[in-house]
Amino acid sequence: MDIKLKDFEGPLDLLLHLVSKYEVDIYDVPIVEVIEQYLAYLATLQAMKLEVAGEYMLMASQLMLIKSRKLLPTVVEDEPEVDDPELELLSQLEEYAHFKAASQVLAKKHEVRAQYFSKPKVELVYEDVTLNQDKTIQDIFLAFSKIMAEKQEEIRRRHTTIARDDYKIEDMMLIIEEAFSAKNKLFLDELFSDAKDMNQVITLFLATLELIKIHRISVQQETIFGTITLRKEWTNE
C-alpha cells in the first residue's frame, strides 16, 4: 500500500485536499488548522523515512511563516500590507482549484469521446474504485498523522528513552488481528493505545495498511474529520 506524496500533483494539490474537507469557501477555511495538518503530514512521512520532495518543504517554510504571523498579536497599521502571504497563498489555491476542476471536465469529455471510437477498456469500470481507495488511504494517513503527534507528546511526557527497532510488520499484523478476536470493529486510535515507542506506532500503522491492502480489514469514516473505524472482514473459524 503506497503512501507517497506522488499521490498528489504538488504541494498545492495536498493543500487543496486538506481544504476541501471543510466544504467551505477557500477564503473561509481555518488556515492555521490546515497548515498544522500539512506540516503533520510531512513530519509523518519523514518519521517513516519516506522521501519528501523539495517543493513540499519549500511550501512548508512558507506555511510556517503564515502560521507565525497569524499567531502574533494583531497590530494596527496605518497602511494595509502590500504583500500578504496568506492572501497570496489562498489566491494561488483558488486558481489551482479552478484549473484542476477544468482539467477533470476535459478528461471526462475525452473519456466519453474515446468510447465512441474504440471498444471501452475494462479498466475504466474500476477507475472510480481506485480513486476512492486512494482517497480513503489519504484520509487514514491524515488521521494517523494526528495520532502520531499525540503519541509523541505522550511518550515525551513519560520520559521514555528506550526504543526498539526490531518490530516486524508481520508480528504487528497478528497483534491487530488478535485485537479483532472479540469484536468486529475498532477505532483506529485504539490500535496505538498500548504502543511503547514511536517505532512500534509506525510499524503498527504499516501493518494496518497491509491488512487493508489484502482486504482483511476495511475502513469507514462517516463524517469529515470524523473517527476512522476499522472493520474485520473475516469470520472467526
UniProtKB/Swiss-Prot annotation:
Keywords: Cell cycle, Cell division, Chromosome partition, Cytoplasm. GO terms for cellular component: cytoplasm. Its main location: cytoplasm. Disulfide bonds: none annotated. InterPro entries: ScpA (IPR003768). It is found in: Cytoplasm. Pfam families: SMC_ScpA (PF02616). One of its GO terms (biological process) is cell division. The keyword Kinase does not apply. Participates in chromosomal partition during cell division. May act via the formation of a condensin-like complex containing Smc and ScpB that pull DNA away from mid-cell into both cell halves. HAMAP family: ScpA. Belongs to the ScpA family. Component of a cohesin-like complex composed of ScpA, ScpB and the Smc homodimer, in which ScpA and ScpB bind to the head domain of Smc. The presence of the three proteins is required for the association of the complex with DNA. This is Segregation and condensation protein A. The gene is scpA.
